[in-house]
Amino acid sequence: MCGRYTLKTRAEVLAEHFELPEVPWFEPRYNIAPTQPVAVVRAGSEGGGRELSMLRWGLIPSWADDPSIGNRMINARAETVAEKSAYRSAFRHRRCLVPADGFYEWAKANGAKQPHYFQLKDGGPFAFAGLWERWSKGEKPIESCTLLTTEANKVVSPVHDRMPIILEPKDYGGWLDPQRQRLEDVSAILRPFPAERMVAYPVGRWVNDPRHDDPRCVEPAT
């Protein structure tokens, strides 16, 4: 399960990478956690291009009576996402890209959990495959999202058996394409990211507390 990630990349780099007209300046994020507002890229509401939006991390199904159900729906398994009632409609109609440049997983070591940080070898930005949903049963509508996961590659598997799906830039358009509504239409891109293009290292336990959101989170463990 992916429950923390980073987004430190400059706004102008993100705008170019995701083919957005602009990305507002934002504080670098070193410890993004569930229920927080997160940046997502989705098909433009006016029928063309892409737009950047801020959504709550933890998908709230449209049929839910209590929005707190989203607190635990931060990940969706790619293998079953087209079948699960919580995600079925979003998978067909509301896919998104979730910008990031690294993520954390925890491994058990000497009776404690040791956090590890994963990123691309070039340190650049990438996109998680995501879904988004609108919940309208409260006083104010809530838009929320979840990250798709798959089996871990050889870099992640020593720490965890699952990993978030990192999409290739050439597949961004295909993932956002509203005409591709079946799992078989996109199954080829919902795969583990190539291990040879990733690196990982253990970091200090400072990141364990989601209130800590600074460069110390990604410092190598000593």
Where are these regions (language model features)?
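Short linear sequence motif anchored by a di-proline
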Residues: M1-T222
